[in-house]
């Protein structure tokens, strides 16, 4: 089956005797600091990625503002001149 609560308590007591409470406290605080640093690095990376995507979208918007999708048409005067030359 699984590990019971009594077995976990015995293992914890053995670890405390071997390493001592002060050393375990230091290990715990070091581990907590490492986890905190990792989370901060991940969130900073996400923010940088979001800023990059936002900047690219703004750039694409600015580039697309001056683009017109129209069909070229000739003026009536130009059409008649073209027909006269032919």
From Swiss-Prot:
Belongs to the TatA/E family. It is a single-pass membrane protein. GO terms for molecular function: protein transmembrane transporter activity. GO terms for biological process: protein transport by the Tat complex. InterPro entries: TatA/B/E (IPR003369), TatA/E (IPR006312). The Tat system comprises two distinct complexes: a TatABC complex, containing multiple copies of TatA, TatB and TatC subunits, and a separate TatA complex, containing only TatA subunits. Substrates initially bind to the TatABC complex, which probably triggers association of the separate TatA complex to form the active translocon. Keywords: Cell inner membrane, Cell membrane, Membrane, Protein transport, Translocation, Transmembrane, Transmembrane helix, Transport. It is found in: Cell inner membrane. Part of the twin-arginine translocation (Tat) system that transports large folded proteins containing a characteristic twin-arginine motif in their signal peptide across membranes. TatA could form the protein-conducting channel of the Tat system. The lineage of its organism: Bacteria, Pseudomonadati, Pseudomonadota, Gammaproteobacteria, Thiotrichales. One of its GO terms (cellular component) is TAT protein transport complex. This is Sec-independent protein translocase protein TatA. NCBIfam families: tatAE.
